C-alpha cells in the first residue's frame, strides 16, 4: 500500500509540475504567434472556356506538368485539361492566364513586395540580328507584351507568359531564342568545369579555333557573366564588347542565349510559297521595300518598279500586308522565280554596263588629263620657240640696220 501511494503521489506531482505547467506556459508563449494560412488542395477548373485563346501559357507555367492542351469539338479549339491527381494547386496557371479562363476557390495570397516575373519555365528573347521586322510577333501576342523600340522588336520578359505564339507566326526559324532552365543549367555546369580547369592550370587553350573575333548582340545578352568567367582574354559586358581575344571559342560554347557569336544565318521556315509583285498593279510607291527586313525587294533599273528576289525572301508577308493597292500576291516559288528572272538578268546586264561605263569614264578622264598636260607642255615649248625665233629675227634686223648705217 505504501509503495502504491508513493507511486500515485509521484504521478500527481509529475503531472502537476511538468505537464500542466507546460500547457499553461504554452498559451503565454504562443499568444502572439499567427499560424500560416492553409488551403486545401483544390485544383483549378476551366470556368470560362469561351474566353480561352489557346495560348498554352497555363501549360508552360505548370510546375507539375498537370495541364495538357486538348482539342474541344464544342468550342472548336484547344482547351486546357487539368490532371487533378498531378495538380499541386499552386495557381500559377491562374496567374498567367491573360483572359481569366481558369478559376480556383483558394490560392496563394498576394503579398506586398517586389514585382516578380510571371511563373514560367522558359523566357523568350528576340534576336535583333536575325529578326526581319515583319511585325508578326507583335500582332500575334495575346497579352501585348511585344513592342517596337528604336526600330527593333522587344519582348517584356517580366510580363511574357511564354505561350510561344510569337514563335509560331515568326517566318524565321531562329529569330526568337528560347532560354529555359535546362539549357541554362547545362551552360553553367560547362562554364564551371572550364573555370575550374582554368584555375587549376589544367585548361588547354587552343588558339584560332574560330575564324574571327566574336561580337556580342546586346539585345540577347543578359549579363550573366559566364562568358567573362571562361574568357582567357577580356570581355567588357558594360560595353558589350570583346576587348582581347585568342579565338578559342570558349565564350561561344557557354553562352546560354547565343548572344556572343561570329555569324548567325537567317533561315526561313517556309519554302513552299513566295511573294511576287504584279507590275500592272504596282504604283511604284516602294513601301514594300521600306518594310522588308531581309533586303529581298530590289528596284528594277529598267522599269524603276520593285521586284522580289525569291532567294532572299523570308515569306514574312509584311510587304503584302502594307501594299496599298494589293499588288503583291502569294505564288509557288517556281512561279516567283520565273516572274522575276527577266528583271534579274536585265539588272545584271545594266549593272555590268554601268561598271564598264564607270571604268571607261575613269580611264577617259585620266587620258584627257594626260593629253591636256601634254598639250600644255607642248604649247609652252612652242611659245618659247616662237619667242626665241622672234627675238632672233629682231636682233638680225637691228644688225642689218646697224651695218647699213655704218656703210653709208
From Swiss-Prot:
Annotated InterPro entries: 4Fe4S_Fe-S-bd (IPR017896), 4Fe4S_Fe_S_CS (IPR017900), Fe-S_Ferredoxin (IPR050572)
Alphabetized GO MF terms: 4 iron, 4 sulfur cluster binding; metal ion binding; oxidoreductase activity
Listed PROSITE patterns: 4FE4S_FER_1 (PS00198), 4FE4S_FER_2 (PS51379)
Residues the record lists as binding [4Fe-4S] cluster: 52, 55, 58, 62, 87, 90, 93, 97, 131, 134, 137, 141, 160, 163, 166, 170, 282, 285, 288, 292
Pfam name, any one: Fer4
Membrane recorded as keyword: no
Keywords (A to Z) from UniProt: 4Fe-4S, Electron transport, Iron, Iron-sulfur, Metal-binding, Repeat, Transport
4Fe-4S ferredoxin-type domain: residues covered: 42-72, 78-107, 122-151, 151-181, 212-241, 233-265, 273-302, 304-333
Name of the protein: Uncharacterized polyferredoxin-like protein MJ0514.2
